Amino acid sequence: MFQSYPKLCDILKDKFKFILIDEYQDTNPVVVEIFLQHLKQSNRKNIIGFFGDSMQSIYEDGVGDLNAYIQAGEVYEVQKEQNRRNPSLVIELANRLRTDGIEQHPSTDNHAPNMQDGRVKEGNIKFYYSAQGVDDLETLKRTLDWDFDNAIQTKELNLTHNLIAPKAGFGELMEIYDDDKIIDYKNRITKYIKENNVATDFSEKTFGEVIEILKDGKTGRELNQVNPTPGMQTFIDAHSEQFEDAKQYPFDVFKKIYLDKDSLLDDTKKDKEDENKKGTKRDELIKHLFKIQNNINLYKEERYNEFLRKTEYRISSIADKQSLKDTIVTLDSMSDETIEDVIDYAHDNGICKKDDKFDTFLRDKEYVYTQVKRIKFQVFQNLFYYLEGYTPFSTQHKIKGAEFDNVLVVLDNGNWNKYNFEYLMNVEIFDGLTTLKKSSFEKILNRTQKIFYVCCTRAKENLVVFYNLPSDAIIEKAKMWFGEDNVIRI
């Protein structure tokens, strides 16, 4: 619109004489184009400032850098060379990691966070690796003797939630929401129906009946299109009872079930002081479980007025107070009971009623509830405390902008093919790659360089990087970056 209607450019410049854009590297290129190209249609004056660091452009939909505009004279660059956060050893490491030519140095401000007694803190950097075919991460954590219970001071940074889930104790829930190949197979079937314009009326059919109808009369390649892929079949073979249950659901209901990590993990806090964002993609079952745990916590923290508002629990006598206390004590001790038992107990005792949204979820996504309800409530509680920022675990993307005294960076791709830490620390690997992998090498390397830079520069005191089973080339690169004495085999 700004391109087509110059009057809008006049209005914007009249309204805002100064436009300051924070974290510019994450700004959509179209927005940058509006500010730096389309606004030139107006003769009115204003100033636009971009604040950020291109080395921290870790989101794919961001502009990344303004190099093209700088080279064209559209933007004047003021380089921020003073570093107020990191100790000197981390600053030196960060300078080795930077690819934009900027070299930072400690702030000269004696009141800067990284200054102590008029001098910049030295800090500590270490690169640990395991070479025995055993992941020695837990051994390393015991060796470090950091307080991993203090999520404000100490963080373990992993690339993906999938890597964190088993460590934080909610792996069973993660498998349901992010690794259900039966749902993937359902998606394969619905895609086949749509792309092949299958006109059959399936409204009265079950998922299993639809599969049989589509398979009927097909052989060879045609049959393969409606059969599970090998990966799906492996999952189905291992979860045969679950698959048989899935086949009994009405297809019109089952085809609308979609599962993804956001339904489970959206709105993850950096720490317990972080605020929840408005709106969340969590599904109604997870929201309901959150209400139960929040209500338990409100009572235990003696926030009784807030508890009564949230639950609408009625207290009219001393006996009611004692009954409520007994109920909370019982509910709080049900960690080893199933999620279904906890939901039913909380409902029956007025702690968290099953509302219309919960009932709708149960009706439309019974398949999901059937799996979740069998899991111990402790698994959900582990998820709760992870999402609420009580644990030391965080994804490497989540902590941009944050800072911690102690940072442990785990270099594991987690089967995410957009990143590759081996590329980062052994660029000579390029020559041995296939043609296809060579075509994506630069993009993957760029992403990995920047996420690693972001992770390392979160440390205010101590930085430790861990790599399981590195090659000799990776160890040599680590010695170049961290110093030979700081590269340690566990």
Residue ranges: model-predicted function:
Residues 1-490:
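The feature marks helicase ATPase cores and/or their adjacent C-terminal helical subdomains
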